[in-house]
């Protein structure tokens, strides 16, 4: 609901939903401290709220819990979310570095995902991003 409200420009309503989600996620983190899903979601919410330091810390924690080196199938999911966090908070170069890497590995980014994900709106027109899209575009 926070994302939907934010997309409609209803900032105060969006913040209310995000704050409630943060409370719920923090409770889940206490209950399941080794579940990276809660950290990555928390990081994405913090990024949307402009809490950049908290966003990056939560995103990094998710990647520490389940790194690609430990799980090549699901580990990239959390690195992908971290690249979204970096993009949302305006850390373009870090986001692009991650996207370039993640577009080159199995279980990494695919064309449609990058093409449509609003998390990458801030870097969509960057030449490096466009190059990744070009390389991932399915051949017909």
Map each language-model feature to its residues.
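Alpha-helical protein-protein interaction modules
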Residues: 1-140
